[in-house]
Amino acid sequence: NPTQGVKPEDMIRHLMGEDLKVGCCLTWGPCFDFQKRFFTGDVAEQSLYPYTLRYDVEVSGFGSHMSGHLNLLNLEDQIYPGGESKEHWPTLGLNTLRWAKKQGAICGPAHSSIGLTNFIGRLENTEAQDGENNLPNFQIPAFDGIGANEFIVDVTHQIPGPTGELIPAVDFISTMNTERVAEWNMWYHVLNCGFRVAACGETDFPCMSGERVGIGRVYAKVDGPLTFEKWIQSIAKGRSYVSDGYCHLLD
């Protein structure tokens, strides 16, 4: 890995090489104080339409990261009030979400299945109730990692949005870059409980997946010319689907 991260002029070339129209480059714990200079609260000037690059934040190596890493997209401000770096952030993910959603961010957990693949048992009286291909299943995860751990609590909350209206604390669950049965199982159970949360494609490059960007992709329906704002709002509204990019043509 680069010692201080990948610069925007390099990241836009990765997007173009994989024909990704939109890429979110997330500043995280290691090298945060170097990478934070690339955040502008808008698309990066290196973007070459339709290839659009934007810098935002993954809460990883921060105060609340043990509750599960969070992807905070479409931020206006990248640093939680009270400091200039990453050490002073809340220890509870929901408090980070309250701050992010107040400024109009679209949020969800990163690398969701980390912490969901070790089991401590299963729900009683659920034998023979697992679905086809083990989806959904009723194994109880240990929640012992940095994925969608606090997610199942946060998804039940509504918190104030930019104008004070109550909106969902979580917009999506990240998928496609970690163990997929565990990712989809969490999503299925949340949907079955009545919470409408989108699935979002993810590639944790170059930390977890050094092969290439675009291993997990999210395709969003937008009206008119593509912009980052239209794309991210379509994901929040569920006007999207995920794919690995190999079979994505729909009529």
Residue ranges, per PLM feature:
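Extended, charged catalytic domains and RNA/DNA-binding interfaces, predominantly
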Residues: 1-251
